């Protein structure tokens, strides 16, 4: 009964179903084991291959050692001649091998290209669908429709990228499949664990059911009891438990079936994952093979590139060495030519001497036919002639001696350079002493200023006395007129009484009465027309010191006299004895409250002077730091006493008699001894002016050394005249105390202060040196033909300022000084003087204002150059040695400026180079008005004036012109070298590469076309700016476009993101308009527009052709992209165009070698115009049919 209730449960199916996942795991394990074994086998093969490689290398090394040993034995065994022959044979073999290698490389390149094409065709056929559009696009973009090697490489690169992307996708799918397999294995293990747990529970429950049944049977048998109520109850409970267990077993079976189905699905998915993994591995192996092939090809290409780069670098080094050797040979050739010229000159001189001697010999032979003594002399002379011939024959030996002397001079130059290095310490010590002396001189200047201010107050107090003196003078003149009228009346009465005509006595009166009383006073010239007061004073004659008061210039009297004062006395010229008194009178009159100058005038004047002193001090400090020569010069001049020499010169020399009216009527009052006006000899023009202005000429008076002494034969003075004479003496003493020729005197003007003055004159400072030198230069030879030039205040007079206050001056004072310097230059140019006739201040003003030389060079020229003749005759070595200009470009700047001024100011200059008035130059106002009214007719004049006036100086070139060309990176080099518009056409390639650091050939080409643009505009800066403004908003006149304007045009096309690439690229309007070989592809390359962006390139091509056709004279060839026609040579292109902007007159006017373009067809171009490939850069693309590809560095 128990057997019927509890049937057996078959577990065979369950066990069979549980074996499936274990078998799947076993298969996976077997697969992993096979993969590991395969990996180990591959590693073993790799190790074997590495071992074989190591053994091969070892064997190769041993063979190399054997080869070296055999070569040594062979070299020992063979004789020397055979070795030389073998060397030559080896050289020939090496050359032959090099040629064969080149041929093999070319063949390999061709084979590689063919193999690459075949491989590409295979790959394209394999991946035709993915690469079809790319190939079509690339063939459409290429001009000729033929894919080149670069296109093949690009296609290979895209193919490799495609394979790489496929490999990544396969790897991603493999990784996902492996992750899914791992998850399924985990689920399988969990299900297996659950089944095991269920089996254990079933086994436990079965054992539990059997044990209670056995126990119940035993109890019944033991007790002998039958089946009662307890057994029925127990069976019912067991049946319920059995039903429950059957239900649970059914549920477990259902769950097991579900797990089996899931297991089968997992196995299927695992199989598919294994298949996909195999496919992925196959694809990966193929991709790895392709990648290895591509890497091998890439390594081959890199090796070829490295060999080409090495060959290029070696060629470049050889080229540089050849250039250096060429430069050395050129220098040696120039030196040999100079020596040869010197020898020719000497031989020519010897030949002339020989001819002269032969002529003299013939003359002596004719004269000495009968004289034996003369024959002896002739024999001696013949012997001397023979000696001369021998000397002439030994001329080559003398040349050798000269060469040896040249070598000795070079050695001396080296020793001098060593001495220059050793003198640096000496310069430092000298700078300390100079600083000390400058501080001491500054203190003395401050004391001097205080004393001058006290003297100024005394002058103001004396001005009232001067007014009183004027009143007394007026009264005296009235008394004189009354006395003269009485004398005439009395004489007429006497004549009437005696019966003589009055005219004869009136005519002889100046020679009778007055000449007897005042015999030493010079008389007036006959026929001079005088004013009433002039006539009275003329009759009275000059009475000693009063001549200084009566002979003051009329213009100064007119400026200083107040309204309602007396008419001025007659104008005359001061003699040497009365100049100091006249200066004192003029200074007091101009500084008096009644005049138009007061204390502020003197303060401003002192400020200007002290500012000039400080400027000179700074310039001296900069000079003494540069070269040994300037330091020695400073030392010698600082140790000298400039003020003593100045005082000695002024005390020993007398002034010439011609002190012009324009000199005394200068804008600034003569406040110091250094403002002594310039002197000039009398000229007919000035005599005519004097006659027109009623100015009588007088003879020169006593020298300066007579001082304020009154002649002893003057008439006995009246009390009023004695008082006037005492006031005149006091005024003369005060004027002498305020003179700037020496240090300040006491405020009282006493004799003690006069005796103390020589002690203060020995100030050993650079101030005294400068003032002494400049005073000597000013008082020197008055050899000038123009009175107006002589009366113009010079630069040294205005800049030399012994008592100025530099810190108190404003910009107005600098403007005044610049205006005075401009007046100097304009006066010199208005007179039409040649450059050699210019004086030192004019030359210094020209250097500072028109040439634009730095302050230290201007100071050096001021110290060393005293006239235009000295400046014009300076050679290159003298400029370097005397002025201290060591930079060759600075010397070039100075030489070109000197050549220009010498040519433009020479009397032989053509009429076209002069203005309508016949002068070479005009003032700034005249130039601006002329250029505003008659611009087209006077282009040559404005060009030359602009160059000469310095409007296109180095600051304009560095700050304006270079940025407009798109080359602002070279600004600092151009500014350091002071490159101005004159120098642009004279810069050669060596200077551009070396000193200006312009290594890029395209940048040099860009600079050349910028210079051509300036040539076509005749270097007219205003015309350039005007045309740029006019073409700012329109597409016209592209030649004057700047780099910024070109960038704006590119931005306006919608290519703003590429426009910034033109910064510092050298692209400007002149390059676009004048370079026939520059096309849109070059511009696209500089803009860095990618070749894939076909739309932007087409837009650029269209707009570029429109720009060239509308804004330039160029004409683009429509079939240029198809026919690949070569552009015309730059030599043919520039021969005709360079001469458009230069007329024959302007070419004749220029000095030799000044404008190479005016001489015709680029006489000596400073740089090659070919567009060479920039150094260190390979071309980005190549064209078929041998077309050269230009590349521009950007």
Swiss-Prot record:
Protein encoded by which gene: PPFIA3
Residues where Phosphoserine is found: 17, 142, 207, 431, 508, 640, 645, 668, 683, 737, 794, 1123, 1164
Organism: Homo sapiens (Human)
Pfam families: SAM_1, SAM_2
Compositional bias annotation for Basic and acidic residues: 202-217, 548-559, 624-636, 687-701
UniProt keyword annotations, A-Z: Coiled coil, Cytoplasm, Cytoplasmic vesicle, Phosphoprotein, Repeat
Functional summary from the UniProt entry: May regulate the disassembly of focal adhesions. May localize receptor-like tyrosine phosphatases type 2A at specific sites on the plasma membrane, possibly regulating their interaction with the extracellular environment and their association with substrates.
CDD domains linked to this entry: SAM_liprin-alpha1_2_3_4_repeat1, SAM_liprin-alpha1_2_3_4_repeat2, SAM_liprin-alpha1_2_3_4_repeat3
Region annotation Disordered: where it falls in the sequence: 1-23, 202-233, 525-583, 624-819, 1157-1194
UniProt free text on domains: The N-terminal coiled coil regions mediate homodimerization preferentially and heterodimerization type alpha/alpha. The C-terminal, non-coiled coil regions mediate heterodimerization type alpha/beta and interaction with PTPRD, PTPRF and PTPRS.
Family affiliation: Belongs to the liprin family. Liprin-alpha subfamily.
Entry GO terms, CC: acrosomal vesicle; cytosol; epididymosome; glutamatergic synapse; presynaptic active zone; presynaptic active zone cytoplasmic component
Residues of the SAM domain: 838-904, 953-1017, 1041-1110
Name the UniProt record assigns to this protein: Liprin-alpha-3
Sequence ranges of Low complexity compositional bias: 651-666, 1157-1169
């Amino acid at each position: 009964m128990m057997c019927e209730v509890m049937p057996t449960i078959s577990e065979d199916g369950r066990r069979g179903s549980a074996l499936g996942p274990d078998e799947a795991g076993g298969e996976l394990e077997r697969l992993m084991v096979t993969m590991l074994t395969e990996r180990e086998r591959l590693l073993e093969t790799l190790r074997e291959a590495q071992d074989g490689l190591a053994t091969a290398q070892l064997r190769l090394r041993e063979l190399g050692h054997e080869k070296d040993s055999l070569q040594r034995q062979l070299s020992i065994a063979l004789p020397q001649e055979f070795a030389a022959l073998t060397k030559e044979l080896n050289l020939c073999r090496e050359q032959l091998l090099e040629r064969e290698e080149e041929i093999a490389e070319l063949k390999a390149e061709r084979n590689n290209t063919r193999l690459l094409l075949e491989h590409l065709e295979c790959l394209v056929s394999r991946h035709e669908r993915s690469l079809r559009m790319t190939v079509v696009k690339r063939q459409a973009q290429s001009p000729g429709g033929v894919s080149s090697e670069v296109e093949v490489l690009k296609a290979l690169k895209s193919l490799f990228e495609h394979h790489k992307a496929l490999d990544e996708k396969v790897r991603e799918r493999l990784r996902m499949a492996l992750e899914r397999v791992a998850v399924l294995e985990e689920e399988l293990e969990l299900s297996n664990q659950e089944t095991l747990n269920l089996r254990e529970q079933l086994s436990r429950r079965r054992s539990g059911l059997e044990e209670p049944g056995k126990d119940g049977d035993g109890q019944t048998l033991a007790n002998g009891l039958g089946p009662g109520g307890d057994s029925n109850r127990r069976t019912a409970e067991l049946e319920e438990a059995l039903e429950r267990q059957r239900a649970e077993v059914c549920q477990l079976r259902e769950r097991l079936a579900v797990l089996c189905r899931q297991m089968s699905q997992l196995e299927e998915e695992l199989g598919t994952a294994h298949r996909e993994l195999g496919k992925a591995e196959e694809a990966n192996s193929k991709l790895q093979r392709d990648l290895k092939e591509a890497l091998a090809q890439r390594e081959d290409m890199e090796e070829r590139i490295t060999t080409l780069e090495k060959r290029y670098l070696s060629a470049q080094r050889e080229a540089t060495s050849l250039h250096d050797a060429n430069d050395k040979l050129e220098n040696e050739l120039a030196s040999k030519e100079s020596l040869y010229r010197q020898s020719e000159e000497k031989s020519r001189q010897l030949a002339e001497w020989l001819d002269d001697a032969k002529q003299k010999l013939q003359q002596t032979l004719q004269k000495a036919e009968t004289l034996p003594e003369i024959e002896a002399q002739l024999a001696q002379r013949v012997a001397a002639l023979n000696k001369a011939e021998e000397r002439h024959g030994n001329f080559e030996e003398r040349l050798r001696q000269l060469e040896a002397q040249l070598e000795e001079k070079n050695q001396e130059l080296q020793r001098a350079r060593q001495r220059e290095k050793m003198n640096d310490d000496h310069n430092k010590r000298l700078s300390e002493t100079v600083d000390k002396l400058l501080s001491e001189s500054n203190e003395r200047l401050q004391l001097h200023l205080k004393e001058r201010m006290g003297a100024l107050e005394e002058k103001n107090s004396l001005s009232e006395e001067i007014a009183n003196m004027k009143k007394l003078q007026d009264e005296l003149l009235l008394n004189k007129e009354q006395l003269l009228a009485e004398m005439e009346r009395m004489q007429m009465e006497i004549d009437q009484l005696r019966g003589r005509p009055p005219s004869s006595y009136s005519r002889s009166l100046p020679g009778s009465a007055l000449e007897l009383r005042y015999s030493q006073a010079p008389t007036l010239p006959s026929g001079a027309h005088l004013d009433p007061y002039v006539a009275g004073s003329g009759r009275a004659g000059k009475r000693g010191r009063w001549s200084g008061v009566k002979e003051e210039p009329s213009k100064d009297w007119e400026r200083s006299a107040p309204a309602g004062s007396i008419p001025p006395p007659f104008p005359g010229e001061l003699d040497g004895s009365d100049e100091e008194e006249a200066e004192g009178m003029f200074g007091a009159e101009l500084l008096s409250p009644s005049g138009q100058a007061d204390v502020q005038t003197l303060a401003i004047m002192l400020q200007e002077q002290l500012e000039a002193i400080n400027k000179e001090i700074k310039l001296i400090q900069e000079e003494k730091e540069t070269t040994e020569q300037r330091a020695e010069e400073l030392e010698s001049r600082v140790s000298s006493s400039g003020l003593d020499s100045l005082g000695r010169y002024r005390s020993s020399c007398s002034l010439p008699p011609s002190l012009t009216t324009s000199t005394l009527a200068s804008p600034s009052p003569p406040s110091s001894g250094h403002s002594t006006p310039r002197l000039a000899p009398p000229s007919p023009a000035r005599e005519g002016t004097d006659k027109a202005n009623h100015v009588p000429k007088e003879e020169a008076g006593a020298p300066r050394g007579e001082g304020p002494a009154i002649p002893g034969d003057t008439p006995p003075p009246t009390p009023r005249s004695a008082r006037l004479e005492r006031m005149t003496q006091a005024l003369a003493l005060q004027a002498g105390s305020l003179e700037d020729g020496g240090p300040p005197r006491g405020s009282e003007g006493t004799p003690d202060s006069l005796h103390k003055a020589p002690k203060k004159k020995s100030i050993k400072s650079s101030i005294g040196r400068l003032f002494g030198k400049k005073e000597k230069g000013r008082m020197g030879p008055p050899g000038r033909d123009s009175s107006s030039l002589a009366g113009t205040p010079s630069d040294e007079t205005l800049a030399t300022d012994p008592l100025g206050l530099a810190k108190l001056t404003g910009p107005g004072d600098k403007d005044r000084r610049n205006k005075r310097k401009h007046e100097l230059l304009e006066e010199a140019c208005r007179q039409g003087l040649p450059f050699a006739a210019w004086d030192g201040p004019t030359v210094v003003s020209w250097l500072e204002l028109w040439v634009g030389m730095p302050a230290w060079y201007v100071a050096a020229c001021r110290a060393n150059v005293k006239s235009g003749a000295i400046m014009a005759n300076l050679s290159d070595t003298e400029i370097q040695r005397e002025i201290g200009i060591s930079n060759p470009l600075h010397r070039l700047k100075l030489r070109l400026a000197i050549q220009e001024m010498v040519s433009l100011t020479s009397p032989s200059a053509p009429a076209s180079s002069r203005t309508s008035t016949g002068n070479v130059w005009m003032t700034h106002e005249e130039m601006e008005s002329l250029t505003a009214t008659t611009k087209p007719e006077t282009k040559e004049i404005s060009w030359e004036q602009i160059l000469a006036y310095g409007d296109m100086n180095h600051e304009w070139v560095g700050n304006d012109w270079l940025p407009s060309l798109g080359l602002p990176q070279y600004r600092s080099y151009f500014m350091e070298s002071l490159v101005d518009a004159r120098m642009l056409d004279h810069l050669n390639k060596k200077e551009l590469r070396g000193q200006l650091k312009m290594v890029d050939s395209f940048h040099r080409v860009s600079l050349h076309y910028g210079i051509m643009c300036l040539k076509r505009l005749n270097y007219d800066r205003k015309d350039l700016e005007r045309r740029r403004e006019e073409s700012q908003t329109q597409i016209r006149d592209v030649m004057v476009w700047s780099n910024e304007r070109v960038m704006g045009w590119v931005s306006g096309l919608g290519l703003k993101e590429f426009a910034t690439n033109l910064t510092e690229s050298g692209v400007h309007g002149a390059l676009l308009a004048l370079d026939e070989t520059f096309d849109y592809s070059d511009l696209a390359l500089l803009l860095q527009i990618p070749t894939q962006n076909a739309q932007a390139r087409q837009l650029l091509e269209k707009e570029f052709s429109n720009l060239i056709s509308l804004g330039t004279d160029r004409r683009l060839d429509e079939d240029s992209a198809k026919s690949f026609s070569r552009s015309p040579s730059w030599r043919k292109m520039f021969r005709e165009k360079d001469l458009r902007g230069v007329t024959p007159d302007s070419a004749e006017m220029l000095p030799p070698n000044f404008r190479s373009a005016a001489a015709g067809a680029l006489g000596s171009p400073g740089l090659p115009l070919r567009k060479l490939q920039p150094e260190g850069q390979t071309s980005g693309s190549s064209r078929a049919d041998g077309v050269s590809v230009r590349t521009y560095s950007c």
